[in-house]
Design a protein with these regions (language model features):
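Terminal alpha-helical segments
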Residues: 1-127
């Protein structure tokens, strides 16, 4: 099924918003590993929407992260803190999904959730 770029961007941003809502619910229910996963994916969907807008499409998470840092963080289109957040969220998701005996504290997850919300707002403005 072929869809136009605008529709796909809107869809990815909708996924981003829904995934952030899932992160909030997970955190409220002390499912902190799940919250970490959903925080990362909320950012990932937003950056993938930005990639689509800029004709950069990849299925590789690391490539998307590198592209974002090169084109938006280093060029100062977004604040460095957002690049750090996205990288940290990626690492946090990796740890929560693949490592054993990983734990996150509620404060850390709440802080990342707040940053994710700000990050998604910033990405929306770039679209």
């Amino acid at each position: 099924m072929q869809v136009d770029k605008s529709t796909l961007i809107q869809y990815r941003m909708k996924r981003s918003s829904e995934t952030l809502d899932e992160a909030k619910l997970a955190a409220e229910n002390d499912r902190l590993l799940l919250a970490a996963n959903r925080i990362y994916y909320s950012a990932f969907y937003a950056v993938s929407a930005l990639g689509i807008k800029n004709d950069f499409i990849t299925t590789k998470h690391g490539q998307l992260l590198g592209w974002f840092n090169q084109n938006f963080v280093k060029s100062e289109l977004v604040e460095k803190r957002f690049g750090e957040f996205y990288r940290n969220a990626f690492q946090m998701r990796q740890r929560s999904d693949y490592d054993d005996f990983v734990e996150f504290d509620k404060e850390s997850i709440d802080e990342k959730f707040k940053l994710a919300s700000e990050f998604i707002d910033k990405i929306s403005k770039l679209l």
